[in-house]
């Protein structure tokens, strides 16, 4: 089984890329976000999930082990496959996805192809496992800080700011000042947005 591939990107497609490893081109499905950040000729390493089902043989690639682990956890939910897991990772940053499940935030998980029943099933079946994960890869460690960050982002979105820039600014502030109070966090974030 393939666990990791390192090679040169030769082609970029809508949902996948071709990774040349020693003269062999592997078609690897990954997030649109990653595809958009790459260019042909670039070297790349991806953690691989090799999916077999009857006559289907697909490779799914992830930039880091944590993304791979999250996709693996999601794929265990009835109705979720790696393609849908990639859609969720494309829609939400890794830390946001983990936070959404930890906070049982159903609205954040509703995307094309995932209805209300499936969102509830994702939360019900993965909640305990996701509680064991760190929600942000750099800086926010305690569950209190995770809650403060989530509340701050929600407040900024309710004030009319887009979620992605709000999340980025909040994480930037919290990485530098993990013990910040929520009111000060929102005030600083408003100044930066």
Swiss-Prot record:
Q: Which GO terms describe its biological process?
A: DNA recombination; DNA repair
Q: Where is this region: Domain III?
A: 150-193
Q: Which residues form a coiled coil?
A: none
Q: List, in alphabetical order, the Gene Ontology terms for molecular function in this entry.
A: ATP binding; four-way junction DNA binding; four-way junction helicase activity
Q: Which UniProt keywords apply?
A: Cytoplasm, DNA damage, DNA recombination, DNA repair, DNA-binding
Q: Where in the cell is it found?
A: Cytoplasm
Task: Specify where the region named Domain II lies, as residue ranges.
Answer: 64-148
Note down the stretches annotated as region Flexible linker.
Answer: 149-150
Enumerate the Pfam families for this protein: HHH_5, RuvA_N
Q: Supply the domain comment.
A: Has three domains with a flexible linker between the domains II and III and assumes an 'L' shape. Domain III is highly mobile and contacts RuvB.
What does the record give as the function of this protein?
The RuvA-RuvB-RuvC complex processes Holliday junction (HJ) DNA during genetic recombination and DNA repair, while the RuvA-RuvB complex plays an important role in the rescue of blocked DNA replication forks via replication fork reversal (RFR). RuvA specifically binds to HJ cruciform DNA, conferring on it an open structure. The RuvB hexamer acts as an ATP-dependent pump, pulling dsDNA into and through the RuvAB complex. HJ branch migration allows RuvC to scan DNA until it finds its consensus sequence, where it cleaves and resolves the cruciform DNA.
Quaternary state and interactors: Homotetramer. Forms an RuvA(8)-RuvB(12)-Holliday junction (HJ) complex. HJ DNA is sandwiched between 2 RuvA tetramers; dsDNA enters through RuvA and exits via RuvB. An RuvB hexamer assembles on each DNA strand where it exits the tetramer. Each RuvB hexamer is contacted by two RuvA subunits (via domain III) on 2 adjacent RuvB subunits; this complex drives branch migration. In the full resolvosome a probable DNA-RuvA(4)-RuvB(12)-RuvC(2) complex forms which resolves the HJ.
Of which family is this protein a member? Answer: Belongs to the RuvA family.
What name goes with this protein? Holliday junction branch migration complex subunit RuvA
**What species is this protein from?**
Neorickettsia sennetsu (strain ATCC VR-367 / Miyayama)
Which gene holds the coding sequence for this protein?
ruvA
């Amino acid at each position: 089984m393939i666990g990791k591939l390192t090679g040169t990107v030769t082609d970029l497609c809508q949902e996948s890329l071709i990774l040349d490893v020693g003269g062999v081109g592997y078609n690897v499905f990954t997030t649109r976000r990653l595809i958009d950040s790459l260019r042909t000729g670039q070297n790349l390493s991806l953690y691989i999930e090799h999916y077999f089902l009857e006559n289907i043989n697909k490779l799914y690639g992830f930039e880091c082990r944590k993304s791979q682990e999250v996709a693996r956890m999601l794929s265990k939910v009835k109705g979720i496959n790696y393609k849908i897991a990639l859609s969720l990772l494309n829609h939400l940053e890794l830390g946001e996805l983990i936070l959404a499940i930890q906070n049982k935030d159903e609205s954040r998980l509703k995307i094309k192809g995932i209805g209300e029943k499936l969102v509830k099933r994702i939360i019900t079946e993965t909640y305990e496992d996701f509680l064991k994960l760190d929600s942000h890869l750099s800086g926010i460690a305690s569950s209190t800080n995770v809650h403060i960050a989530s509340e701050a982002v929600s407040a900024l979105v309710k004030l009319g700011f887009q979620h992605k820039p709000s999340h980025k600014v909040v994480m930037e502030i919290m990485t530098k000042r993990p013990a910040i109070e929520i009111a000060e966090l929102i005030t600083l974030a408003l100044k930066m947005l």
